[in-house]
């Protein structure tokens, strides 16, 4: 009920958009959730190229025919705009299928996975957003660490842990030194994390206003009166109704309301990880851990942003934010997750098929020319 009350009313553009999300995209997302629930999740392991190629085609179409907005290309399909920020949520699952198929290559497959993860990060940084990069790094990093500990690629676990840590260090260094130069206000945003009041009318403006609004919030109920600037941020036309939904709930209904939302999400993640780690199949564990890590990264990015730590823009609060693309994708991921929990107990891993075969199409040996069509 609290969340339904945050739906804007009126005839403005935000109210119209929110009505579309509630009455059009929400039923469509629920239908997608049901469809993904009954889909055999092994599809992503048997056909690991489908999702990455699909994302590549969408990005190509957005680059050629999309509308430039907010520094990125948006693909417009009628009244539906594909958000590049939300589309980045699918990249961890796309990597998961390829990572599973690379098991057949042993140590070489693990190294190739690290290179592939770096390529994904660079692609996300150019075609999507820095939030998507961090979400992917977290999800892929956890997946590679679990694979190393459980010896899914090779029996020499310590070697893979060392390679994993080295890859993480390289990615962190890359992101730290690359991002501020890649984005115009990178250094200013980094500065506002520590001293948001240093530039209250510039890059630290939103952070300062959010902290002021939260300082007027109470334990339960409506917050104390704020100035005209903060009051404007809390109107129906404000982004506090979408990207900063927790801050909105905290001010209007108290810290208890936002605490309940965070607690429910924490319980969902806790039960999900507990179920995921009990999966008997390797691919079932991979898919479930990847999706749960994606949800976790979304929440970990969303909460600090709502507390006024404005380093990067949040992607979405899973299942609750108004964004049509984010809602659609999160519901689809939840459907795949429950599909794993539904059939994961009976699913058995098949022998991995190598992506890179050692056999040659044409061979010359002992004066004989052999052509293999296998």
Describe the predicted segments one by one.
Residues 156-259, 283:
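Hydrophobic, glycine- and aromatic-enriched re-entrant/interface helices and adjoining loop segments
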Residues 273-314, 320:
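Loop-to-helix entry and N-terminal half of a specific, functionally important transmembrane alpha helix
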Residues 43, 57-82, 181-192, 228-230:
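Membrane-interfacial helix-loop-helix modules of multi-pass inner-membrane proteins that assemble, modify
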Residues 111, 301-374:
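A juxtamembrane structural motif centered on a specific transmembrane helix
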Residues 109-124, 130-179:
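Hydrophobic alpha-helical segments of polytopic membrane proteins
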Residues 48-69, 121-125, 167-176, 294:
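Hydrophobic alpha-helical transmembrane segments
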Residues 1-69, 325-342, 346-355:
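A structural signal for hydrophobic alpha-helical transmembrane segments in multi-pass membrane proteins
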Residues 15-48, 89-104, 142-151, 270:
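Transmembrane alpha-helical segments and their membrane-water interfaces
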